[in-house]
Amino acid sequence: MFKEFREFALKGNVLDMAVGIIIGAAFTTIVQSLVNDIIMPPVGVLMGGVDFTDYFIALTWSDVAPVSVDAAKEAGIPVIAYGRFINAVIQFAIVAFALFLVIRQMNRLKARIAKGEAPAPAAPPRQEVLLEEIRDALRAKG
């Protein structure tokens, strides 16, 4: 059983998938920073100094109006945190676009390789070549 597991774990596809997951996790951190620290602040300024992370709808009323999603959650108020959802949608769009660019380049590279590696047409069998020579000789006589 251990031998089978080792063979499975050391297959190229499993190792490639593991590397992809690790790189994906690191890429997620980069994208989150890009969205939260670089993209959203200018968008917030353009919209009048808005910080989307604190946009929410309180589902119950309380005596004290919470000023942030975290404050509302600490007070036990259920909220719909649509500002965080907006950030998540933007992050998803960035990741999807980045993956699109990578896959697009890979497909282009595969197409170039396929064009360069097109197999040469196979040579006709020797019998066929001899028959064509005989045919050509008979036509020349005739």
From Swiss-Prot:
It is found in: Cell inner membrane. One of its GO terms (cellular component) is plasma membrane. GO terms for molecular function: mechanosensitive monoatomic ion channel activity. The chain crosses the membrane at residues 14-34, 83-103. Keywords: Cell inner membrane, Cell membrane, Ion channel, Ion transport, Membrane, Transmembrane, Transmembrane helix, Transport. InterPro entries: Mechanosensitive_channel_CS (IPR019823), MS_channel (IPR001185), MSC/AndL (IPR037673), MscL_channel (IPR036019). Pfam families: MscL. The keyword Ion transport applies. It is a multi-pass membrane protein. Its main location: membrane. SUPFAM superfamilies: Gated mechanosensitive channel. Gene3D superfamilies: Large-conductance mechanosensitive channel, MscL, domain 1. It comes from the Bacteria. Belongs to the MscL family. Homopentamer. Channel that opens in response to stretch forces in the membrane lipid bilayer. May participate in the regulation of osmotic pressure changes within the cell. This is Large-conductance mechanosensitive channel.
